[in-house]
Curated annotation (Swiss-Prot):
It comes from Saccharolobus solfataricus (strain ATCC 35092 / DSM 1617 / JCM 11322 / P2). GO terms for biological process: translation. This is Large ribosomal subunit protein eL40. The keyword Ribosomal protein applies. One of its GO terms (molecular function) is structural constituent of ribosome. The gene is rpl40e. GO terms for cellular component: ribonucleoprotein complex; ribosome. Belongs to the eukaryotic ribosomal protein eL40 family. SUPFAM superfamilies: Zn-binding ribosomal proteins. Transmembrane segments: none annotated. Keywords: Ribonucleoprotein, Ribosomal protein. The keyword Metal-binding does not apply.
Length: 56
């Protein structure tokens, strides 16, 4: 079910995309994290910010 309401879409994007991903173990971390919560590595990246497109 695609979202058409811009306000709801913005809320979903903030919940889903404002995360950091550990490059060592793949754990999701808060956006303000400096170390991974699982393996304590400092090698973090931002989650990729693109919505999946509907194929068809």
């Amino acid at each position: 079910m695609p979202l058409t309401d811009p306000a709801k879409l913005q809320i979903v994007q903030q919940r889903v995309f404002l995360k950091k991903v550990c490059r060592k173990c793949g754990a999701l971390n808060p956006i303000r994290a400096t170390k991974c919560r699982r393996c304590h590595s400092t090698n973090l990246r931002l989650k990729k910010k693109e919505l999946p497109t509907k194929k068809g």
